[in-house]
């Protein structure tokens, strides 16, 4: 609190852990900042009361709409697999959007917390959320190759947060 008058604005990207204790602590701190000085960037915190500035992405609607562009291809797959941790920032919004999209379009969906050989099955599609340093994508492709599956022919991968390394991995 002693620093609240030191700056004209506080620009915060609220990518905090989603567990209840962390969120409670973060909300307590953020509510101390006067609304006129607070600007949230990239992620909206619906739990934070007040009339503060915010510029954010609507991850849920963007994901839902993006999946719609691939609906025809998704309908050819027997299951939509999402690999993520429930504590990830993207799980809360993108995971919900994937569930809603699959329900609305009658597509089987399954959530996983890790990539194991058992979840890699032919004619299925995979989405990896929060893949740190693309390790999740690398692991998925490595395990698929061990099973003699080719990406694009035997399994499909939806890239979230596209990066140049995908060109090499895939």
Where are these regions (language model features)?
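Flexible loop/turn connectors
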Residues: 121-170
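Short, conserved loop/helix-junction motifs that constitute active-site signature segments
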Residues: 29-35, 74-75, 148-152
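Short beta-strand elements of ligand-binding domains
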Residues: 12-14, 33-45, 152-161
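Structural motif
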Residues: 1, 12-17, 42-43, 83-88, ...
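A short, well-structured beta->alpha microelement
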Residues: 1-2, 105-119
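Amphipathic helical "hinge" segments at domain boundaries
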Residues: 1-11, 96, 105
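Hydrophobic alpha-helical segments within soluble ligand-binding/sensing domains
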Residues: 42-81, 136-137, 161
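Short, solvent-exposed amphipathic alpha-helices that sit
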Residues: 62-69, 89-107, 139
């Amino acid at each position: 609190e002693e620093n609240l008058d030191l700056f004209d604005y506080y620009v915060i990207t609220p990518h905090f852990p989603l567990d209840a204790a962390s969120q409670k602590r973060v909300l307590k701190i953020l509510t101390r900042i006067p609304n006129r000085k607070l600007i949230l960037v990239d992620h909206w915190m619906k739990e934070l009361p007040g009339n503060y500035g915010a510029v954010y992405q609507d991850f849920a609607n963007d994901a839902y709409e993006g999946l719609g562009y691939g609906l025809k291809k998704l309908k050819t797959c027997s299951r939509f697999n999402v690999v993520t941790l429930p504590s990830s920032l993207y799980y809360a919004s993108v995971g919900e959007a994937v569930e809603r999209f699959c329900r609305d379009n009658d597509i089987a969906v399954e959530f996983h917390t890790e990539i194991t050989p058992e979840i890699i099955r032919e004619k299925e599609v995979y989405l990896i959320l929060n893949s740190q340093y693309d390790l999740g994508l690398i692991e998925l492709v490595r395990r698929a190759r061990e099973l003699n599956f080719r990406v694009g022919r035997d399994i499909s991968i939806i890239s979230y947060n596209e990066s140049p390394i995908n060109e090499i991995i895939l």
